[in-house]
Amino acid sequence: MSETILQVKNLKKHYMVGRKGLFGEKEYVKSVDGVSFELHRGETLAIVGESGCGKSTTVKSLIRVTEPTSGEVILKGQDFLKLKGEELKKARRNIKMIFQDPYSSLNPRMTVRDIIGEPADIEHCYKNEEERENLILDTMEMVGLNKDFADRYPHEFSGGQRQRIGIARAIILKPEIIICDEPVSALDVSVQAKIINLLKELQQKLNISYIFISHDLGVVKHIADRVMVMYRGHVVEEGTRDEIFSHPKHDYTKLLLKIGRAHV
């Protein structure tokens, strides 16, 4: 088995929604309730389930877009949830995200050059403008974007091209982990296949680990090494792609496979 690079232990995210009476106990919605899993180097772990199952809240909590209620997220021997300041900034360099909507996730006032280069600008990881330019153009080439596109703006591109820009932005610092939040659901089927193949190529070149959130089981079957099924904030089943698709154990997993698609 390959190296474990991320361990999530008993992750919880509870939202207070009220009280039982004026002075009664607090009432909570348990969006994520005791989720644990591991991610191995160079693999793709897919998280699937219907809308409201907790899959998106899980990844938002583990990268602290929303602060979790409790749990541990062990990255490189450190609990990511306890890091602050420069330590947190440094750790975040190793976890990046590709978003569902390739248009709304890109600043319309920025050129492709500046969108892709922004993470490098924030980290100051180049010596001069020439090195910055080479880094950006090399990254564009890696994701199949023509270097002549560098001075254009997001509205000038198709959905697939915009997603390539988003992918370039995510990989420019060579992170170890990328969270893919429904990265192809807004794209045409023919474009979906090209983006999935690109993600797989980049994974082989850069040894990236993906956490892949999706409601499309067809896409999951094509890209995932392992699959984690969530229902009402809990992990109900986890296994290899073949185990989940060919020999599901939990009734909820069987239902998802039967309908062929877990609706968002």
Model-derived features: where do they sit?
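Conserved ABC transporter NBD signature motif
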Residues: 71-79
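Conserved ABC ATPase signature
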Residues: 153-157, 161
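A short, proline-enriched helix->beta-strand linker immediately N-terminal to the Walker B motif
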Residues: 172-176
